[in-house]
Amino acid sequence: MATVDHREAGQDDPESEDEVYEVVDLTEYARRHQWWSRVFGSNSGPIAEKYSVTTQLVMGGLTGWCAGYLFQRVGKIAATAVGGGFLLLQIANHSGYVQVDWKKVEKDVNKAKKRLKKKANKAVPEINTLIEEATDFIKKNIVLSGGFVGGFLLGLAS
């Protein structure tokens, strides 16, 4: 943080006050005041500073297992719905109920791919900031993150 003394030229009046401005570096402020401090209060911080390694592993493992298990269940339901929809579409097409112009479908899909690639190349700065915050969180809480990944994989397998 720095201060800047601002005086107008030609003002030698003893009654005039010097204006002092405080320059705040917002990037440094944002690094010192993480998002969890704004959400959970000033007593919150990295989990590594509050809990033992064993507690972090158990917390990460349990939350990871729950997330993996739910991801597996929802994924199976979604895959069944999408696959069933394609199967019904093929049966309807084969039976003559539906006529699909596959060349037009392919053309539209390729057009959508090109648009998506163009938009993906123009990364939004907010996404980069979010990725930096997530990476910083993982680095500061590596034990918890490792437990989460292990639990997530176990949840997918169960």
Curated annotation (Swiss-Prot):
Entry's localization field: Mitochondrion outer membrane
Transmembrane residue ranges: 51-70, 77-98
Pfam families found in the cross-reference section: FUN14
Location (main, coarse): mitochondrion
Membrane topology of this protein: Multi-pass membrane protein
GO BP annotation list: autophagy of mitochondrion; response to hypoxia
GO cellular component terms given for this protein: mitochondrial outer membrane
Record keywords, A-Z: Autophagy, Membrane, Mitochondrion, Mitochondrion outer membrane, Transmembrane, Transmembrane helix
Keyword hit for Hydrolase: no
Chain location of the short sequence motif YXXL per the record: 21-24
Protein role: Acts as an activator of hypoxia-induced mitophagy, an important mechanism for mitochondrial quality control.
PANTHER family: FUN14 DOMAIN CONTAINING, FUN14 DOMAIN-CONTAINING PROTEIN 1
Similarity comment text for this entry: Belongs to the FUN14 family.
Name assigned to this protein: FUN14 domain-containing protein 1
Gene giving rise to this polypeptide: fundc1
